Amino acid sequence: MHHELQTLADPGAVARAGAAFVAEHARAAVAASGSFHFAVSGGHTPWAMFAELASQAVPWEATVIYQVDERVAPPGDPDRNLTHLTKALGPAPAQVRPMPVNDSDLVAAAASYAALLPEYFDLVHLVLAPTGTPPRLYRAIRSCRSPIAWSLSPSRTRGGCG
């Protein structure tokens, strides 16, 4: 696999390049297997990319988007990552698999969500925040020697996988 480091002029250029990258991988995955399984991170960083992605030539009818991070808040709440994801994508007809963070039994909800996940994702989008996330992520990747297990975060204010 070829890796390339790009330096882009501004956040808008990053959003456009990210959207083009996702769209290209979506088309390739659908051509190869008939579907595109895309895991997306939370936070505000990817919102502009998702807005750009909505206008790209993406095979939306074959695209399934999975959340890997969510806050426990009512549907439509501005603290919810899902609120911003669906707003940014607009009318794009992708199938979005929201995390069931408002269920009364979050352990059962996490197990239910895990059952929906594909064995492999075609693409995983992660946000590396300036708050120290990159070093933790890199340590986790280096130490990962077995398949990732999906789990509920111990915090009742955020859901996630790890």
Segments predicted by a language model, with ranges:
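N-terminal glycine-/serine-/threonine-rich phosphate-binding loop
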Residues: 1-38
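Conserved phosphate- and dinucleotide-binding cores of soluble alpha/beta proteins
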Residues: 9, 13-14, 73-162
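Glycine-rich beta-strand-to-loop/alpha-helix junction loops that act as flexible
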Residues: 40-45, 126-130
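Short active-site-proximal "capping" loops at secondary-structure junctions
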Residues: 44-46, 71-72
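Histidine-anchored nucleotide/phosphate-binding helix
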Residues: 49-57
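Short helix-capping segments at alpha-helix termini
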Residues: 56-61, 91-92
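Local beta-strand N-terminus motif with an aromatic residue
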Residues: 62-63, 121
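Short internal beta-strands
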Residues: 64-69
